[in-house]
Amino acid sequence: MDRWVKDISGKSLFLTNLDKLFWPQEGLTKAHLIKYYSDIAPFLLPYIHNRPLVLKRYPDGIEGEAFYQKECPDYAPGWVETFPVHHAERVINYIICNDLATLLWLANQACIEMHATNICQEGVIT
């Protein structure tokens, strides 16, 4: 199973490269990561609700090069929510992950780490 299309609450989610090894020594794949995030979603989503995320992506697995991403990519599905944060030189449209579809889309983007910022759509969290 290398590709899969799933409908989550009316949102079409295209999952790809599911057999790609993310943890080679353990034999764990992207499909394992997606299932993990699906399993923990009820516990994780309340903590990152309405918070802009800084993502750490590992496109070649945990042993490959990783990079941080703040800006929502142009190719993101239209249903992925963003929140503009004004910085000195530009505006960054951070991803907001409030639902399972977005969480699994992030996992499909090889986003192993998600770091919630200390701001939310309503303002600064105190």
Task: Annotate the PLM regions.
Residues D2-D7, K11-I125:
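Active-site loop/lid in soluble adenylation, ligation, and acyl-transfer enzymes
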